[in-house]
A protein has these predicted regions:
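Exposed, interaction-prone extracellular/peripheral surfaces
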Residues: 2-56, 65-74, 80-85, 89-308
């Protein structure tokens, strides 16, 4: 068996290799805890699902591109690389066209957990995003993170780079994704509590859909937000607008609150469905594996309908 021991780069090699190598070592030195959790979740789900490589693709559908630092060494086509001084990676055409973009909301309203036993919403959103990204990169697909300015990429380095960016959200991070200019085959996963005003959500959705993307919305719900278990005197603080409401008997508004909450959630779902997008709801007191399987299945089903 050939040795896999690490060999340092020869100092005579071009300096252009130094920066990618240093970044790879930095990303691999310490994994964010949420990525560790996501990888544990992914491992369980991966065993229960089949790869989504399109059937019937033969050798004539392969194409080659230059090797990038984030690519796995197993993806190198050595026969093609032997014809040149560069390394080449072999891809199927449909795989090369697939890129999945992510937008994880980590705004003020997402930094909430009603119980110690459940994670804050932004943490669950991060774990689900990373777990799905891990599944996709295992299938050879590219992933990208909106708002970073970085191009999409594939492989373990891409996943770790994404994890480091998601693990440390900005204090005043936007709750809506930026405009997206992409190829029509690309997809977008938007994970949020979707508590923004409905007109803002609808406007953002239309802009993304008109850019050519197909998308998947995942609403992250804290159990208290849906059940409203409060009784007696209760104080409610809205972190996003720094507003406070005090109720003498909170239980008296429960029925009306739940109607409004459900109506808001249903409206977001209708916006998505009218555009041909998928909408899933997930509570933080439920298993993240269930949500991951549903989301992964929704992507596979939508691609099958679109002929990808």
């Amino acid at each position: 068996m050939a040795s896999t021991a690490y060999q340092p780069f020869d100092s005579r090699q071009p300096e252009r290799w130094d920066r990618p190598r240093e970044e790879a070592e930095r990303l691999g030195s310490a994994l964010p805890p949420l990525l560790v959790e996501a990888e544990r979740l992914t491992s369980g789900v991966w065993l229960g699902v089949h790869g989504r490589r399109k059937a019937g693709m033969g050798e004539t559908f392969w194409q080659f591109r230059r090797y990038r630092v984030e690519d796995s060494s197993t993806s190198i086509d050595w026969r093609q690389s032997a014809k040149s001084q560069h390394l080449f990676v072999r891809e199927r055409e449909w795989e090369a066209a697939e890129t999945v973009w992510f937008w994880r909301d980590a705004s003020a309203s997402m930094r909430y957990a009603s119980l110690k036993a459940v994670p804050e919403k932004w943490e669950r959103a991060t774990v689900l995003s990373l777990a799905l990204a891990s599944l996709l990169t295992r299938g050879g697909e590219r992933i990208g993170l909106l708002g970073t300015g970085a191009p999409p990429s594939s492989g373990r380095i891409a996943l770790r780079r994404m994890a480091h960016r998601l693990a440390d959200p900005e204090p005043e991070e936007s709750d809506l994704p930026p405009e997206l200019h992409i190829k029509r085959q690309c997809e977008l996963v938007w994970v949020s509590d979707f508590l923004q005003p409905l007109d803002a959500i609808e406007s953002a959705l239309k802009g993304l859909a008109y850019s050519g993307a197909h998308g998947y919305l995942v609403q992250i719900i804290d159990p208290a937000e849906e059940d409203f278990p409060f009784t007696g005197r209760a104080r409610f603080e809205a972190r996003s607008i720094r507003d406070t409401t005090i109720l003498g008997r909170a239980e008296t508004v429960k029925a009306n609150y739940r109607r409004r909450y459900d109506a808001h959630s249903e409206a977001v779902g209708q916006f998505a469905r009218r555009l041909g997008w998928s909408f899933l709801r997930h509570r933080t007191d439920h298993s993240p594996a269930t949500a991951l399987i549903a989301l992964y299945g929704a992507i596979g089903g939508a691609r099958a309908q679109r002929g990808f």
